């Protein structure tokens, strides 16, 4: 039988036979495989043989193939000479495998055997190089097998650990970058980095392509119809991707993939700085803690961020976009987390209770703020006058007394205020609206605080006490006037 021409650049390439692409086991090793793996082995071997026959290479049918075709347990499988000792595989997580696992991993190897001599004459035939990339002849031989077995070259087998097999040597190197987390290809437009050039090229279309797909709900435009479809799930709340382990549903497949690691405990990416382990995207973000890198910059105000998601959220300050809408009351929010907190308002649920006084709160942050009443803690200090405050909002309002800033303006009369709540109260003066009514006498008031003060007429409550003589008063102003009796102060002068 004539020899088949070898790939370009080869020297005295030998015949490609079934043994060159076969995987052989001993009987004991075969019995270590489960039923599904044995079936997989049968399918791959039969398909490899059929491909050789179609190329006119295999003449006689090996006993192994006859046995497999009859669905019998191969009695003659052996492992005296294991062909393809150096396949192109990802070995990032293959360390410390048990012997049984090692046997099973043999199923996951694409077979590569030496088909001739290397350029160096002192090397023996059938002695393999350490890797495919070391020897151009082997590399060529591998590509030749790659062409002959086009139907089977892309088969990928996985165990619980990552031992992925590739049809091309270059694909192996590209895959390894997923484990290292290294992203060598950077977009000049927005600074986003990618581990593969093809991903960068795909991403750059975002900057050049016209955004012709518009969301009818919020008006946002997209380059691809698929991106619009995914975006719509924000409004519809659709979650088509469900975890089989716990039943939790997700809007995006990527979110489901990340979630699954909670159950498996998989954290394949390690921080070289501290040795902590993460998922790939989390590792990239975590590394920026050490480097201080902030590659995502807002074109509107120049503020920089370490995460693209934080930049996306920030941009809504400028656009006013509020894509997260409450189905209960119609109120919209810029962040999904804010909507989640808001929903508790409707349920009335108060999970956080103060151990000091028993008062319950909807949010943990509100409870923490409340606790400062008992502890007296005032962590916010004014650099201008030294006055301290327990709340950041109160501190912000106070600073405006020094700057004179009054950002909240009444459209009706032009009067400006330093607090939004003060403006809100002021507006009621123009409407004449009196929403707060006394159940006791029917009298109505503009402000709730005024109603509370009025109620003391009916209840007789006197919350203001003089420290000097223990006399009590209904109103703060009455206590202030009373104190003048003790001090002898006469603030009002007759002219």
UniProtKB/Swiss-Prot annotation:
It holds the Pfam family KRAB. The keyword rRNA-binding does not apply. InterPro entries: KRAB, KRAB_dom_sf, Krueppel_C2H2_ZnFinger, Znf_C2H2_sf, Znf_C2H2_type. PANTHER family: IP01015P-RELATED (PTHR24377). Residues 16-87 form the KRAB domain. GO terms for biological process: regulation of DNA-templated transcription. It comes from the Eukaryota. SUPFAM superfamilies: beta-beta-alpha zinc fingers, KRAB domain (Kruppel-associated box). It comes from Homo sapiens (Human). Its main location: nucleus. May be involved in transcriptional regulation. This is Zinc finger protein 716.
């Amino acid at each position: 039988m004539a020899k088949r021409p070898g790939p370009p650049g080869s020297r005295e390439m030998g015949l490609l036979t079934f043994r060159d692409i076969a995987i052989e086991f001993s009987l004991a090793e075969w019995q270590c495989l489960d039923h599904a793996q044995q079936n997989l082995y049968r399918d791959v071997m039969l398909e490899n043989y059929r491909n050789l026959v179609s190329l006119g290479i295999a003449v006689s049918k090996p006993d192994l193939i006859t046995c497999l075709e009859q669905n019998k347990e191969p009695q003659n499988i052996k492992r005296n000479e294991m062909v393809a000792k150096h396949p192109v595989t990802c070995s990032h997580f293959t360390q410390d495998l048990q012997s049984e696992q090692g046997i099973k991993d043999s199923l996951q190897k694409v077979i590569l055997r030496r088909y001739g001599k290397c350029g160096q004459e002192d090397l023996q035939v059938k002695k393999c190089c350490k890797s495919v990339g070391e020897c151009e002849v082997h590399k060529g031989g591998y590509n030749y097998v790659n062409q002959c077995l086009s139907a089977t070259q892309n088969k990928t087998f996985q165990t619980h650990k990552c031992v992925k097999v590739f049809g091309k040597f270059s694909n192996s190197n590209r895959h390894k970058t997923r484990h290292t987390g290294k992203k060598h290809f950077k977009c000049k437009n927005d600074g986003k980095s990618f581990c593969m050039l093809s991903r960068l090229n795909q991403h750059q279309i975002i900057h050049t392509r016209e955004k012709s797909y518009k969301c009818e709900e919020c008006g946002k435009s997209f380059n691809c119809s698929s991106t619009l479809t995914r975006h719509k799930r924000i409004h519809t709340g659709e979650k088509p991707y469900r975890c089989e382990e716990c039943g939790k549903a997700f809007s995006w497949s990527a979110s489901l993939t990340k979630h699954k690691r909670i159950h498996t405990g998989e954290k394949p990416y390690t921080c070289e700085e501290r040795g902590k382990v993460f998922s790939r995207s989390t590792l990239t973000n975590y590394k920026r803690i050490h480097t201080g890198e902030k590659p995502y910059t807002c074109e509107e105000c120049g503020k920089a961020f370490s995460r693209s998601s934080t930049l996306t959220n920030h941009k809504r300050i400028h656009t006013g976009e509020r894509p997260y809408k409450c189905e209960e009351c119609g109120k919209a929010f810029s962040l999904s987390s804010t909507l989640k907190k808001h929903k508790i308002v409707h349920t009335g649920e108060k999970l956080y209770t103060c151990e000091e006084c028993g008062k319950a709160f909807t949010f943990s942050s509100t409870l923490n703020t409340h606790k400062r009443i008992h502890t007296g803690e005032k962590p916010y200090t004014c650099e201008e006058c030294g006055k301290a405050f327990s709340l950041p909002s109160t501190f912000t309002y106070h600073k405006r007394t020094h700057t004179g800033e009054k950002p909240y303006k009444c459209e009706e009369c032009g009067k400006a205020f330093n607090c939004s709540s003060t403006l809100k109260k002021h507006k009621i003066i123009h409407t004449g609206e009196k929403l707060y009514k006394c159940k006791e006498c029917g009298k109505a008031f503009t402000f709730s605080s005024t109603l509370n003060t009025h109620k003391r007429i009916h209840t007789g409550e006197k919350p203001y006490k003089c420290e000097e003589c223990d006399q009590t008063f209904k109103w703060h102003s009455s206590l202030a006037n009373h104190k003048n009796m003790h001090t002898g102060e006469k603030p009002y002068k007759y002219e």
